[in-house]
Amino acid sequence: MLLSTKNLDFFVRKSHILRSISLDVNEKEIVGLLGRNGAGKSSIIKCILGLYAPKSGRILFKGEEITNVSTRRRVLSGLAYAPEDARVFPELSVKENVKLSTWIIEKRQDGETFDLEQGFEIFPKLRDLWERKGGNLSGGEKKMVSVTRALALKPDLLLLDESFEGLSPLVVRHFSNAMGRIRNMGISILLAESNLANTARVADRAYIIERGEAIFQGTPGEIEKEESLSLILGR
């Protein structure tokens, strides 16, 4: 087991945001977190990364408990994150945005370095955009940069928050293919997503998150057959 959360509870003031969330991600697996906006998907991702502190529960990564470990140490141990808003610096080139991760990976004890050619294999379009300023990129291009910057950390688990949001069908297809290539590199993915069809393209399994609870777990095919989930997922 690569990642496991055990009964995570998270509050914002008196609001109970996550309720006893337990989930697992195996090595070389793509797992979806499916649910409506505000269901708690992003909060799960941020608890795993250490940006949010759960009130109770445990987080295990590669067999070690990381519940109270700093975000920096979690990243150094093999977690990486591409946020929904991409956070590409507009005045920096694509090359400079990606290489922001270099100083972190140099601290990794395993000595691994990022192979830029692997990044181009995942998103071939980036080769032509390498010197372009971040402020001159489309939304889809910014997300490519954000994911590549996360991959520059040489993670074991990539956390993606709404990576398909706002993308055209063509770009969604490119991203779906990219996720398959990322898994072929031996990297697992935990993907927060509101669209079942997009998740079904890439995920081995998915958890349905509703009002902070994981109410169902199964393959995308199994989820599609559950009529009771239609209202939750807006199908």
Pin down the residues of each PLM region.
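ABC-type ATPase nucleotide-binding domains, specifically the catalytic core motifs of the NBD
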Residues: R13, L92-F114, I122-P124, G218
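The feature captures the beta-strand-to-loop junction immediately N-terminal to the Walker
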Residues: L34-R36
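Helix-to-loop junction immediately C-terminal to a conserved catalytic motif
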Residues: L49
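Conserved ABC transporter NBD signature motif
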Residues: G57-E65, S77, G111-L116
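Conserved ABC ATPase signature
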Residues: K133-L137
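ABC ATPase C-loop
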Residues: A150-L151
